[in-house]
Amino acid sequence: MKKALKKSLYTAVLSTVMAMSITGYALAAEDFDDAEDMEFTLDSMVVTASRIPTKITDAKADISVITRKDIEQMHISSVEEALRTVPGVQFLNYGGNGGMNANMSGLRINGSKEIVVLVDGVRVNEFQGSDSGYFYAALTNNMDNVERVEVLRGSAGTLYGSGAKGGVINIITRKVNETKTSIDVSSGNFSTREYKLNTMGRQGKLGYNVYYDDKHSGDFKDGSGIEWKSDIDSTSAGLKLNYDITDNHKLTLSYDKTKAEFSGYDYIYHNNYSGHHDSYSLTFKDDITLSDKWSNSFTYRRSSTEGEYAQNNHSLFNADLSYTYDFISDQVTYLTNRHNVVFGVDYAAGKDDDAKEFTAHSGKYEHFKMKNTSYYVQDDWEIIPHVTLSGGLRHDRPSNSGQTGASIETHTSKSYKLSWDVTKKDNIYAGRSGFFILPSIYQITNKQYGNASLKPAFGRTSTIGYSRSFDDYNIFTFNWFETKTERGIGLTAAGYVNTKGLSRGWNAQFMTQLGEHWNANLGWSHLYQYEDEDTYSMGYSPKNLATFAVYYDYAKVKAGLDGYYFVRRVNDDYPDGWPVDNYAIFNMSASYAPTKNISIYAKANNIFDKMYSERTHVIYASGKPGDWYSMPGRSFVLGMQVNF
């Protein structure tokens, strides 16, 4: 069974990390130019909760924000690094093994790997199903181009479609309203080096943004001093053009490409591995404001992904995959004093470029393709002053072709929520939201583990929330949730099967400004989770996860300290499955700006050199203590950024 799961996981990584798609509505973030503006206050806007710009205190949702200031304070280099201190977010990473990791590896929100990732409101994962929470996209590598990252916890299936069970991550890029070029060079231990270029400018109605990132890392040591062989070279590049036809009519064209090559040694299977994964996406958007009440957003995206993973002596683990996707979305927004209405249609089509004709144990396939058309509507209605009733519907009509087997059923997801502004500072809400998850192309067509009869997953999440705004700079939120998976998708030795599951827990966070130069974010998440027939999940869930971040900013000096404390929910069947069940990770960063245009920085990750792991092989029959993929130990980076 372990080989079956391992093989499927290797292939799923390549098939899902690079899946890219869309969802219609995108809003550019406000551009912040000075330190005072970068502070996140109650007046700051978020868009992910309702697809409409809303103050964070009016969102009535379990949401967190990583701001531009947070990114700069900690010199955060990737979206994964930014998300590791967000309440309710978990990663299952293969240490520094490049062929088994992605930009965001094994990502979970509220215990679920079924999430939606957006860039400027546009999906970058589609037809992923319930694979492994892996995402691969160029824009997740270069944080110089990112204004903020919004994390919405909880099911959002009616607004964002298939896959939005655990939550939604929206990466919002910087708006082009100035001319600026940034060059960043850094180097550290583990043969780490990175070169980044980001340039933007505006000439009249035309704005542009170009970015390039080149990154290398080599062998690394874990917290116990053991060296792991690894070599990773990756590049990401992109171009975004904005053209303002009028103040109310804007066009955007963007192209993003990423390429990675990797090799190393798998100490669990005692074998060399090598491979690559490449992807690109081309996106066109047309946003128009028709009046003070009506607006429309149209999006088209084409993306292509290709990858290969190979182990020298284990052909069972080899994978060679290539997918192409097309996406069209149109959303209409209607706003009045008492109603915020969004409605629209999303269309997605994907095909397996390598699957010309073959017979798997689950069926016969020829030029396999998947399609899905979704129609949705949501209304936030202030029924009386301070009381809002929200309701939404999404109808999915999926289909596939080139398959001898069961057809995929249609589904309608529903959501509703009632919120009450008890006082000017206190808000409570309660609601329920359904989700619907299509199987991925890989889960259906894989020659060894695919299942032609695999049905979509569906279920619902119930939530109760409370928020307290002490003042403009101090916010507390608490959210309880329960997710019932009436039909899920799990992996066994025999292949993919439909399952059932339950997760329940809560998230709490406190965001505060400590005087003129300090600010902090604190979080605490608690989780119970169970899913039958999914042996892969055993022992991976956290029982409690505490997160923290403290930042200091004064004159030419910036500094930050962040991290998390992980308490594992131990599986009694595998008491020795991990090097440690409870651990704390601390990271720190400091920078000094001798001039306005130059910044010299240093950062240290895992500063106490903690030995820990997020992936284990011990739970399998042949596993033994020590058969886990260790995370890197203490690492250092020294860099310089020049702006002109």
Residue ranges and their predicted role:
Residues 55, 80, 84-123:
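Extracytoplasmic beta-strand/coil segments of soluble accessory domains associated
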Residues 106, 123-153:
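Short acidic/polar hinge/loop motifs at secondary-structure boundaries
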Residues 139-182:
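A beta-strand signature from Gram-negative outer-membrane beta-barrel systems
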Residues 7-11, 23, 27-28, 43-45, ...:
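Conserved C-terminal beta-signal and adjacent last beta-strands/turns
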Residues 259-261, 306, 351-356, 399-411, ...:
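Surface-exposed extracellular loop regions of Gram-negative outer-membrane beta-barrel proteins
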Residues 382-390, 476-484, 497-574, 599, ...:
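Gram-negative outer-membrane beta-barrel transporters
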Residues 170, 178, 186, 198-277:
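Periplasmic-side early beta-strands and strand-to-turn transitions of outer-membrane beta-barrels
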Residues 244-259, 276-415, 419-423, 470-480, ...:
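Face-selective signature of the C-terminal outer-membrane beta-barrel domain
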